Swiss-Prot record:
This is Uncharacterized protein ZK632.12. Residues 35-131 form the PH domain. Keywords: Metal-binding, Zinc, Zinc-finger. A zinc finger (FYVE-type) spans 152-212. SUPFAM superfamilies: FYVE/PHD zinc finger, PH domain-like. Zn(2+) 1 binds at residues 158, 161, 183, 186. Residues 213-266 are annotated as: Disordered. GO terms for biological process: endosome organization; endosome to lysosome transport. It comes from Caenorhabditis elegans. GO terms for cellular component: early endosome. The keyword Zinc applies. SMART domains: FYVE (SM00064), PH (SM00233). InterPro entries: PH-like_dom_sf (IPR011993), PH_domain (IPR001849), PH_domain-containing_F (IPR051765), PH_Phafin (IPR037871), Znf_FYVE (IPR000306), Znf_FYVE-rel (IPR017455), Znf_FYVE_PHD (IPR011011), Znf_RING/FYVE/PHD (IPR013083).
Length: 266
């Protein structure tokens, strides 16, 4: 089905519509050989809380953004190249159901669908697109993926020392190697993690020791008081929210345009 859609008029219209919804701030998505495979709303676990995001699956990239006006306007476009994407199932945990992890070299995060069927559809289509892309032979799979950040709300104390209570003075930080929420005293050093960022990024003391032992020769970086570290703990995902959070509605059920993937059993 995807091969038949390549450079078809209907596929071109779909991609042009996605570009129009992101406006001038989004990147050009209509390129030769690219196919829009599916689209829909997923709940992304952001640093502060879960929030709805619009996702578009192409045969070579996964695109998502903030919802400004449903099906009409999106912003803060993010593009993940599928050769670096890996999906991992998440077991249901209380109210957090129908979720999985999207792993990439630079950023990894959890997403949730409205139903188990939609979850399986998304995972099947993403895995199939990744497999097809790699089998074509001109892309290589990623060998390292970023850690999933522990949400702020799941840590009232530093997850390294277990003593520092977070408040307005004692801010939360995230280790870029393990994803834990840590205090400033337990994450004062930086280390270059090539798949995450070209410059040294904040890591906790435990990870700094293990990374230094595994990669001798890297110099320690001690930030001065008041200076911001590279990749500081800020997330545009938590800013300028328009539509609020919550699970996907029936109006935002995913639509997939390829018909050659076996549908999950209901």
């Amino acid at each position: 089905m995807v091969d038949r859609l390549v450079n078809s008029e209907v596929n071109s219209r779909r991609m042009a519509n996605v570009e129009q919804c992101f406006g001038k701030m989004g990147e050009q998505l209509s390129v030769f050989g690219r196919v829009l495979v599916g689209e829909g709303v997923l709940v992304k676990m952001c640093r502060k809380k879960p929030k709805q995001r619009q996702f578009f699956l192409f045969n070579d990239i996964l695109v998502y953004g903030n919802i400004v006006i449903s099906k009409k306007r999106y912003n803060k476009q993010r593009i993940l190249r599928l050769e670096g994407v890996q999906v991992e199932d998440l077991e249901d945990d209380g109210i957090e159901k129908h979720g999985w992890i999207i792993k990439t070299p630079a950023k990894s995060f959890a997403v949730y669908a409205a139903t188990e069927t939609e979850k399986r559809e998304w995972m099947l289509h993403i895995e199939r697109c990744v497999t097809d892309l790699l089998e074509r032979g001109n892309k290589q799979a990623a060998t390292a993926h970023a850690a999933v950040w522990v949400p702020d709300g799941e840590a009232v104390k530093c997850m390294v020392c277990g003593k520092t209570q977070f408040n307005l003075v004692q801010r939360r930080h995230h280790c870029r190697n393990c994803g834990r929420v840590v205090c400033g005293a337990c994450s004062s050093r930086t280390f270059r993690i090539d798949n995450v960022h070209k410059k040294p990024v904040r890591v906790c003391d435990h990870c700094f020791d293990s990374l230094s032992s595994a990669t001798p020769g890297q110099e320690e970086s001690e930030p001065k008081t008041g200076n911001r570290l590279h990749h500081e703990d800020s997330s545009s995902d938590s800013e300028d929210e328009v539509n609020g959070s919550g699970r996907s509605s029936n109006e935002s059920r995913p639509t997939f345009y390829r018909e050659d993937v076996q549908q999950p059993a209901t």
